[in-house]
Swiss-Prot record:
List of residues that carry Pyruvic acid (Ser): 44
This enzyme's EC code(s): 4.1.1.19
GO BP annotations, alphabetical order: arginine catabolic process
Protein name as catalogued: Pyruvoyl-dependent arginine decarboxylase
Entry keyword set: Decarboxylase, Lyase, Pyruvate
InterPro entries documented for this protein: Pyr-dep_his/arg-deCO2ase (IPR016104), Pyr-dep_his/arg-deCO2ase_sand (IPR016105), Pyruvoyl-dep_arg_deCO2ase (IPR002724)
Record family assignment: Belongs to the PdaD family.
Native source species: Thermococcus sibiricus (strain DSM 12597 / MM 739)
Amino acid sequence: MSWTTPKKAILLAASAEGSTKLNAFDNALLKMGIGNVNLVKLSSVIPAYIEWIDELPKNIPVGMLLPTVYAHIESDEPGSTITAALGVGISEGNEGGLIYEYSGYCTKEEAEKMVHKMVEEGFKVRGWKLKEFKAAVAEITVKDRPVAAIAAVVMLPY
């Protein structure tokens, strides 16, 4: 197999219930449109000049390996609120960027604040200038079934 530098990326987030925590995770992936592919977990560097898209292509083959940065959390504790978040920082001139993940028992606002802080620090230590920050956040509260929250950046080779 050969890898190529991704050309496009999309920021996604979803939450879902399921009969088990794993089923809740799978259901959230399906909601995002990435439940029938294989996610290859990446660390958090965005390639230069990547194009950000708003919608997944319709022609992604079942079982395709998709480079993905993601945060996730599952719970079956009634009354608990869980959140997964990704913060994306894009440099001036789109010459690269960073993605930071966070998940925990917290609100959407707390999680987004955390990833924003992480992105700012990541840029600072590299001496990069942050042009744009965006976030994907999913929050859900457990009722009577297990739940999952996922935030992801999926990178596409085409």
